[in-house]
């Protein structure tokens, strides 16, 4: 595990302990059980693919450790609506506060403003967080293989699947890909960002995609800024993308989303 992930795990463990004191596990499980059924994150991505379209997991992200503040005028419900209007299949909402200025309320508000399934984008270490995610309405969780052992990943995946959620397994090298392919989830995200240096290279996705059987749905993550980037990764069998920063920086988020997916101009013609 990188030094960055070790620091994140340390503060996450403290957060989880505090959360358990505030809302015991039994209570958070009850809240999760009271939620309506999940919207079907994986299903929404497959539907885009079946229709011959790129699948976009559009990210609602206020800030990041490497870039600082990304969007000062941060309005999660408005962003969710803009993404949906632009053709996104799903949302990804940061709930981590220390590194990304995220919050659970952002997830709740964004999901309520649209019909898209939503991923809780956070660093998951314990089952408590999985039930917490469902209690907040999340339809999918993220498991980062670089921060989890095989047994931890298996256990967390099992908790999520039992709650009717989907699981996005994130990898960034060959060893993590081999581990991810032993899990049940068909959703595998390839992070093009080196977690040690923060450098981004789309060749990571191109290299690792060759390892993946056709029954898995690959998601390209990080470093995807243009329609041309999408077309490049499509050649490696990747037709689903998780994109945040490049869209978050645009004034016209709906237009930028359409442009990313279709290559159309950012300018939306008057209708």
From Swiss-Prot:
Reaction catalysis annotation: 1-(2-carboxyphenylamino)-1-deoxy-D-ribulose 5-phosphate + H(+) = (1S,2R)-1-C-(indol-3-yl)glycerol 3-phosphate + CO2 + H2O
Keyword Lyase (UniProt): yes
GO terms classed as biological process: L-tryptophan biosynthetic process
MF term (GO), any: phosphoribosylanthranilate isomerase activity
Domain of life: Bacteria
Family annotation (PROSITE patterns): IGPS (PS00614)
Family according to the record: Belongs to the TrpC family.
Protein name as annotated: Indole-3-glycerol phosphate synthase
């Amino acid at each position: 595990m990188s030094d960055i992930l070790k620091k994140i795990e340390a503060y996450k463990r403290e957060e989880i302990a505090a959360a358990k004191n505030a809302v015991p596990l039994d209570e958070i499980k009850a809240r999760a059980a009271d939620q309506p059924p999940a919207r079907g994150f994986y299903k929404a991505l497959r539907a885009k693919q079946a229709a011959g379209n790129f699948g976009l997991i559009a990210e609602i992200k206020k800030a990041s450790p490497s870039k600082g503040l990304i969007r000062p005028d941060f309005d999660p419900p408005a962003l969710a609506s803009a993404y949906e209007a632009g053709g996104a299949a799903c949302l990804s909402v940061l709930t981590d506060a220390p590194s990304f200025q995220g919050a659970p309320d952002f997830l709740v508000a964004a999901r309520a403003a649209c019909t898209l399934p939503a991923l809780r984008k956070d660093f998951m270490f314990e089952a408590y967080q999985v039930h917490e995610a469902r209690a907040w309405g999340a339809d999918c969780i993220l498991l980062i293989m670089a921060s989890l052992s095989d047994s931890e990943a298996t256990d967390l995946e099992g908790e999520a699947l039992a709650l009717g959620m989907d699981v996005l397994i994130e990898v960034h090298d060959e060893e993590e890909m081999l581990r991810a392919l032993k899990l049940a989830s068909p959703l595998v995200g390839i992070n093009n960002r080196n977690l040690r240096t923060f450098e981004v290279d789309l060749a990571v996705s191109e290299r690792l995609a060759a390892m993946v059987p056709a029954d898995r749905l690959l998601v390209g993550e990080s470093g995807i800024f243009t329609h041309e980037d999408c077309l490049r990764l499509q050649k490696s069998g990747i037709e689903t993308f998780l994109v945040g920063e490049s869209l978050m920086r645009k004034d016209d988020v709906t237009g930028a989303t359409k442009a990313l997916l279709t290559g159309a101009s950012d300018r939306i013609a008057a209708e």
